[in-house]
Amino acid sequence: SYPRPGWVEMNVDTYLENCITAMAEVTSELRRSGRDPKDIAAIMGDGIICGIVGIDENARPVTPYINYLDSRTTPDVERINAMKLPLWGRETGNAEASPMFPAMFARWFLENSSEFRERGVKFVHNAPYVLMRLAGLSGRDAFIDWGAMSGWGLGYDVMKKRWSPEQLEILGIDEKYMPRILKPWDRVGGLCEAISVRTGLPAGIPILAGAGDTMQSMLGSGVFEANQGVDVAGTCSMFCVSTKGIIPELSRPGTGLIFNSGTLPDTYFYWGFVRTGGLALRWFKDHVCRHEGDGAYYQTLSAGARNVPAGSGGVLFLPYLTGGYGEEKEASGCFLNMTMDDDRFVMWRAVLEAIGYDYMELADGYRAAGVPLTRITVTEGGSRDMLWNQIKSHMLEAEVVRYRNAGGAVLTNCVFGAYATGALADVKAALAGVIEENGSCSPDPELSRRYRDLFENRKALVREDMRKAFSRLVRMRAIR
């Protein structure tokens, strides 16, 4: 739900119920195919790294689930960043707070949620919430893996994989509310009887601590070493680069980048994002084209957009549908520069290019810090659209590659389940053996030049020319 402008709230039990329903369907399908559900050796999951819910003693939610799409904490973020503390960057790799950080959501809950202050015992992410409910754990048994831990943004030591008492004290968050930190493959319990009855799966199946979605997608995309790029083309479009640790040039104020710990030991990565990247695509299909529930319509739009020239004839889409951030904190979503000649296909290409323009800025920052970007792997749902992959290749001046398993996180979870139960000894080798390239795109220098010219003009337009217009639009939204 969207109770106020910039607020995005969910019921975390929706995730739980969807998982239980899917597990029951899998059980039925296994039996129909003559396979025994008792052969399932482990349950492993991954989830959103920037989103939390407050829970009580019985592991039941006492707050809404708030994630990275929410920008209600922007004023608080500005107060935190005004402190200009080197501690943030030194321990987390993140020099500045962001409105999407769970650390900021926790501060908001503690200040504004009487329910949490009275009954709350822990803050948890959505995947650990589902996993602990499947295992029938109490609220005080809450956990988080060391990768998703780094999704908090602030409050922890990323290299030591522990909560930071000094940071938490500054943030005003009592460490008693923080979940215990585990390895992703640690066992947290077994499938409880109540969930066994609802799913048809045998009770006692080992349940693992789980991982972050981006971390698993990167592994599923074959990113095992430093200096590799990944475009996670999901609801929140993310552009990631793997590293060996904190790079000071990328962990300074103003870069807009986030630093995280990977699933495997001694693996790290930076990422920048377009919060409404994939969400903007769905919004256009569902609400502008009125094809809600019709996933095939994406193909119709891209087929028509192939006939639209690179740059969309100067038509721009600004993808700030849930509000802006950073220097563009007052920005809002809009189409610009349209004429009577423009149709849904021009608009669709402009939507695809909008995410690419934000990616160009991220790529410029990576390259300026000495990270080479000549080959980028694209994963998740957006990777299926080869037009979008080709557009990104031109805009980023790099080869773009996709793999047959576009949802790499699911396969990666299966591999970790096997690793945790002793069925295999080497995660990297197992993943490398099943990853198969399924398409690539190369940049056209002339189109790359065109996009660079458009990018520079767009940057000036948004940051300079439209700043007053965005402020006026904010005031207009408040008129009732």
Task: Name each model feature, range by range.
Residues 1-36:
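N-terminal phosphate-binding loop and adjacent alpha-helix
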Residues 13, 41-82, 115, 137, ...:
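Glycine/Thr-rich phosphate-binding loops that ligate phosphate moieties of nucleotide
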Residues 155-265, 276, 292-296, 303, ...:
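ATP-dependent carbohydrate kinase catalytic cores
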Residues 10, 40-47, 66-69, 92-101, ...:
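Active-site nucleophile and cofactor-binding loops and adjacent substrate-binding regions
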Residues 45, 89-212, 281, 286, ...:
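Gly/Ser/Thr-rich active-site cleft segment
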Residues 35-40, 118, 202, 224-226, ...:
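Short helix-loop-beta connector
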Residues 13, 82-98, 199-202, 227-230, ...:
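A polyampholytic, Gly/Pro-enriched intrinsically disordered region
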Residues 26, 31-34, 39-41, 121-131:
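Conserved phosphate-binding loops in N-terminal lobes of ATP-dependent enzymes
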